[in-house]
Amino acid sequence: MRKQIFETLRLEKIVGGGQAIGTLDDGRKAFVWGGLPKELVTIRVTKKKSHFVEGIVTEIIEKSPERITPKDENSYLSTSPWQIMPMSSEQSYKASLIEEAFLLHNITLPEKIEVFSDGVEFNYRNKVEFSWFGDKTDDDEKETLDLAFFKRGGKGKVVVDGT
């Protein structure tokens, strides 16, 4: 088993896909699941490249005032990483991402971007990727086969309750 690498850094902003980005002491960018801008966090590195790393928050040292408890703490990273912020913050970040995409191509928008919603915060999905997880029961008497989400940043799976 490979040695786990942990890094501590301050997160700067949200980038496309729902990750936060920060800069490591050596100058490499870190794309981080489970963090919010301005938070000081410790991450477990899940992918290491020469110019960047990817990771998952393992500890929040300084918490953002925007942070809320996710509705589904066991699987939110796999299913909906935006659950750690209020819907108003999510919409604001998504509008900023759209504006930034236009700015990168030197396109000036005539108006500020507004994100419209039906107000439904949970139980909607844009994309679903499932797998299966097999295991034995606690008493080793029968095998189970459960529906599961893929765990972000790793090879594990998160069993969907009630399957």
Listing of model-derived features with the role each one plays in the protein:
Residues M1-T163:
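SAM-dependent transferase fold signal centered on methyltransferase-like domains
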